[in-house]
Amino acid sequence: MDPPCSLSARFEGSFAYLTIRDRLPQILTKVIDTVHRNKNKFFEDNGEEGVEAEKKALSFFSKLRNEIQTDKPVLPLTDNQSDTELWNQYLDYQKTLLNKGETPSWFKSPWLYVECYMYRRIQEGLVLSPPISEYDVFREGKTESFFQSQPAIIALCTYLQELKNNVANLSENQKKEELSKLLQVCLWGNKCDLSISGGLDNSQKFSILSSLESFMPFILVNDMESVWAVLSGSKNLESGKELMKRVDIVLDNAGFELITDFVLADALLSLRLASEVHFHAKCMPWFVSDTTKHDFNWTIKHLQAANHKWMSKCGVNWKENLQRSCWIYHEHLFWTLPHEFCMMAQTAPDLYSELQKSDLVIFKGDLNYRKLTGDRKWEFTVPFFQALTTFHPAPLCSIRTLKADVQVGLKPGVGEQLSSNEPDWMISGKYGVVQLSTSV
């Protein structure tokens, strides 16, 4: 059976259409503003060359914004980076899906493709504007979100330290409850997505922990029991010894959400549900608030230097986890390609075989869910493993709040009822899933 058609702005009035029409130009306007405001910094760092680069980048971004708004054809990349050829091959592939004489364009091509392409074009605009090529146009928003989420970060770091101090006294059932709590914290931390708010303040200002019970009815797929079963089945029955267990987390947003991922990763080690945690981040600024290597290291460094004892204790511990290699950082170009994940084995076989070593791969956030399911018009009741088509490297769990109109694995009638009661239920971030597939 062929999978359904891709979500696309050609469906007028759809969320994809509104994203391309309104949100992407709005994000580019913010990028233009950020680059312009940093003109003096570019001058201080690079003299006149920096000012010229700023002008060149601004011109590039203004032209890009116009291309989107007027539904121009998608252009090949020209920046000779290590992924340029892959992007241009993907453009050729998109052409093969169209009728003769048609060309891929912003409002006619798959939404997943053109939205990813916009962020890669932003990167191209900087690469072609040396010496400001390394500048992260989204960094200001990410650091601001981190600082504005301080009360929630303090509450979470404090909770983690109390859990670790008490871990020896916990029964198996209590450990299961703690895992469930921290999975929920990871889920609702995923609300802090700057690409959805167009880069406006979207920080976490209160402690999520106190709200978990009231949020429970909004979890549409709750596979937390099964996640516990996957992680806790780690004893060798003959010897009673614990087996090595690897968990991978494919990261989403920097800021508060990244802290929730770190807290979960630390707790997995303390609860002896994992012996090593591998983090996968983006190798370039992406979707406004996605985590890069700089964000990853910056966050740990800022926690270490915090004047709150449990925040700084977390920072110190997490740095040690990296030094001891029980936390391992990865980045791969594939995460910033437009390909859906069922193409990973073919396009990035090295990454696919890396994920195959995992006992559980956790995919954070909406973009990962869209790529897992191919960002298609699936029926709500289609089983998750079926929507993954050929992508089954290891048991995998998606943790996302809904901010795009794709959702599978619901019980019959649930999607329809929500659609009639709350037309924006799939895009508001109010609902979430912790959705597991154990197909391998």
Curated annotation (Swiss-Prot):
Motif annotated as Subfamily III RTxK motif, chain positions: 400-403
Record field: catalytic activity: beta-D-fructose 1-phosphate + H2O = D-fructose + phosphate; beta-D-fructose 6-phosphate = dihydroxyacetone + D-glyceraldehyde 3-phosphate; L-glutamyl-[protein] + S-adenosyl-L-methionine = [protein]-L-glutamate 5-O-methyl ester + S-adenosyl-L-homocysteine
Keyword DNA-binding applies: no
InterPro entries attached to this UniProt entry: ARMT-1-like_metal-bd_sf (IPR036075), ARMT1 (IPR039763), ARMT1-like_metal-bd (IPR002791)
UniProt EC number: 3.1.3.-, 2.1.1.-
Cited SUPFAM superfamilies: AF1104-like
Domain of life: Eukaryota
Binding site for substrate: 252-253, 366-370, 403
Necessary cofactors: Mn(2+); Ni(2+)
Binding annotation for Mn(2+): 252-253, 290
Keywords, sorted A to Z: Hydrolase, Manganese, Metal-binding, Methyltransferase, Nickel, S-adenosyl-L-methionine, Transferase
Gene3D superfamilies listed in its UniProt record: 1.20.930.60, Uncharacterised protein PF01937, DUF89, domain 3
Keyword Hydrolase included in the entry's annotation: yes
Biological process annotations from GO: DNA damage response; methylation
PTM notes: Automethylated.
UniProt GO MF annotations: fructose 6-phosphate aldolase activity; fructose-1-phosphatase activity; metal ion binding; protein carboxyl O-methyltransferase activity; protein-glutamate O-methyltransferase activity; S-adenosylmethionine-dependent methyltransferase activity
Amino acids binding S-adenosyl-L-methionine: 257, 290
Signal sequence range: none
Function of the molecule: Metal-dependent phosphatase that shows phosphatase activity against several substrates, including fructose-1-phosphate and fructose-6-phosphate. Its preference for fructose-1-phosphate, a strong glycating agent that causes DNA damage rather than a canonical yeast metabolite, suggests a damage-control function in hexose phosphate metabolism. Has also been shown to have O-methyltransferase activity that methylates glutamate residues of target proteins to form gamma-glutamyl methyl ester residues. Possibly methylates PCNA, suggesting it is involved in the DNA damage response.
Domain notes: Subfamily III proteins have a conserved RTxK motif about 40-50 residues from the C-terminus; the threonine may be replaced by serine or cysteine.
Family membership noted in the UniProt record: Belongs to the damage-control phosphatase family. Sugar phosphate phosphatase III subfamily.
Name recorded for this polypeptide: Damage-control phosphatase ARMT1
